[in-house]
């Protein structure tokens, strides 16, 4: 050990080369060959066939052990009650279980990230903690999506986990779209490791994030790419600071028996997903877009509902920001500074501020658009109501 600590980079390369020449190296194809086999405390579950066996072969290449038992006699009624309190809708609970099932079985083509959206104190963090308890602490990482996208060394370090939880989604997380798309789809990466060796890998790690609010996606193509690869659960029941609050809510009910029953359920569910090649409730990008527009794309909604474009039109930036402030108050949108608003507005519309002169006054304007007046806003609202009625 002391020799390794004092060794130089060249020495470590020699050691690495010696190990590579004298030992069998596990390759990606070896991992993928046995990826459907899940190692538990009491045996192996084959997701493809739905069969459980207490025997284990040394030929299996399995990177993760689930720290629970496969036991069809166990139930998880206590945990289910808590799930029902955080996610009252059956469809949302099933989506959560389906996502955990995909964490157990990568490379199936059933690829998406899961977000849990809701105000503070609604149990989002508890869902993340419980996902970690189900899959096992050693199989779950907690890096931000932004860091995963930017740090190749971190990518290799967490590539073969079952799940990564980003506990607080940030605007930077949704900017790294190229890496995010590849990671969610579990495509091949090539990154340089320490000692200058490049490594090819396909991540098995699914992504999960928590958010109080979503963020503005300024590019329409980027937005569609995220909608197609994301499902969102909504946690809306407030617990923190109320009589319903229970600290570490899962601790008392998450007994070994309950966890065994839940893991057994999720494993069997993963077999169903594999056989059907889809989740119970397939991802609907239009639904995700609707949620994102409501909880994130506020400025885009303002532009769509309060402005109109035209080559000969222009609007003074000061009046535009005042209109946004009124819109934000009316629709309970998060506040933005002038600079934040102008940057997002320009990214979305492609318009740039220009200085113009009117009589003796100089002012900043956006050319090519104007604000709607009150009658136009009312008429547009009536037209949308008619569209809903027609549907």
Walk through the language-model features, giving the residues of each.
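N-terminal nucleic-acid engagement/recognition segments and initiation subdomains in replication
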Residues: 1-81, 85, 156, 172, ...
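Positively charged interface segments
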Residues: 2, 9, 135-138, 142-153, ...
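Conserved nucleotide-sensing/catalytic segment adjacent to the nucleotide-binding pocket
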Residues: 154-196
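Structural recognition of the conserved hydrophobic beta-strand(s) that form the central parallel beta-sheet
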Residues: 165-166, 205-212
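Alpha-helical scaffold elements adjacent to nucleotide-binding pockets in ATP/GTP-utilizing enzyme cores
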Residues: 127-130, 161, 175-183, 225-229, ...
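Phosphate-handling catalytic cores of nucleic-acid transaction enzymes
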Residues: 256-298
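Short coil/turn segments at secondary-structure boundaries
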Residues: 15-18, 29-39, 94-99, 112-115, ...
């Amino acid at each position: 050990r002391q020799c390794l600590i004092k060794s130089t980079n060249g020495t470590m390369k020699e050691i690495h080369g010696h190990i590579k020449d004298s030992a069998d190296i596990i390759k990606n194809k070896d991992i993928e060959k046995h990826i459907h086999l899940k190692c538990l405390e009491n045996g192996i579950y084959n997701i493809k066939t739905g069969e459980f066996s207490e025997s284990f072969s040394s030929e299996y290449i399995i990177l993760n052990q689930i720290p629970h038992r496969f036991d069809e006699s166990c139930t998880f009624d206590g945990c289910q009650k808590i799930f029902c309190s955080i996610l009252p809708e059956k469809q949302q609970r099933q989506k959560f279980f389906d996502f955990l099932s995909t964490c157990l079985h990568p490379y199936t083509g059933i690829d998406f990230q899961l977000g849990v959206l809701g105000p503070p104190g609604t149990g989002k963090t508890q869902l993340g903690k419980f996902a970690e308890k189900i899959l096992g602490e050693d199989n779950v990482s907690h890096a931000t999506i932004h860091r995963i996208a930017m740090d190749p060394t971190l990518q290799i370090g967490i590539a073969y986990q079952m799940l990564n939880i980003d506990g607080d989604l940030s605007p930077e997380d949704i900017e790294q779209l190229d890496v995010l798309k590849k990671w969610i789809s579990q495509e091949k990466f090539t990154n340089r490791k320490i000692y200058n060796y490049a490594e090819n890998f396909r991540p098995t790690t699914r992504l999960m994030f928590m958010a109080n609010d979503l963020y503005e996606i300024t590019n329409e193509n980027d937005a569609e790419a995220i909608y197609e690869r994301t499902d969102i659960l909504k946690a809306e029941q407030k617990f923190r600071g109320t009589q319903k609050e229970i600290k570490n809510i899962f601790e008392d009910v998450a007994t070994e028996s309950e966890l065994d029953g839940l893991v057994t359920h999720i494993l069997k569910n993963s077999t169903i997903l594999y056989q059907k090649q889809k989740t119970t409730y397939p991802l609907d990008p239009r639904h995700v877009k609707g949620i994102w527009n409501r909880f994130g794309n506020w400025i885009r909604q303002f532009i769509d509902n309060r402005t109109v474009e035209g080559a000969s039109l222009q609007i003074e930036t000061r009046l535009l920001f005042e209109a946004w402030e009124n819109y934000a108050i009316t629709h309970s949108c998060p506040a933005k500074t002038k600079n934040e608003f102008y940057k997002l507005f320009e990214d979305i519309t492609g318009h740039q501020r220009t200085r113009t002169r009117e009589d003796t006054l100089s002012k900043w304007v956006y050319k090519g658009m104007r604000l709607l007046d009150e009658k136009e806003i009312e008429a547009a609202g009536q037209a949308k109501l008619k569209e809903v009625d027609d549907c």
